[in-house]
Amino acid sequence: MSSNYATPLDDEVFPLSFANYQFTEHVSLGEHYSLNTSEDAKYNNLNGPFVVPRDTGKFDLNTSSASDETVFSLDNPQENNYKHQAMNNVQDCRMAVAAKTTQSCDKLTDLYANAAQQNYRLWLSSF
């Protein structure tokens, strides 16, 4: 696994990591959340599906020290403005978290969104 990808935190972590998201065994493949919304045309090229843990409706960016700033809640996607759904650069983001700033984590990029979709499809094809 590339160093740019998250590593499991424990045995319960779902064996799927893309765009540096971690998913637990509670993920339901039938429950998708698509970033392709009519409300925010700026991100209309970021097609889902993105799966989320069914029990919490939240997922954490797997930075070296996750905090409240790196939690995205599906309860209010407009307020969150999708700012933590993908990273501009994983290493920059980790350094930003270490420096107690999320400036480098606030950029949503096609690069990681597309990597997310590709890895998700690859994982599905492994069955």
UniProtKB/Swiss-Prot annotation:
<keyword id="KW-0472">Membrane</keyword>
<comment type="function">
    <text>Required for viability of cells lacking mtDNA.</text>
</comment>
<protein>
    <recommendedName>
        <fullName>Interacting with cytoskeleton protein 1</fullName>
    </recommendedName>
</protein>
<dbReference type="GO" id="GO:0000329">
    <property type="term" value="C:fungal-type vacuole membrane"/>
</dbReference>
<keyword id="KW-0926">Vacuole</keyword>
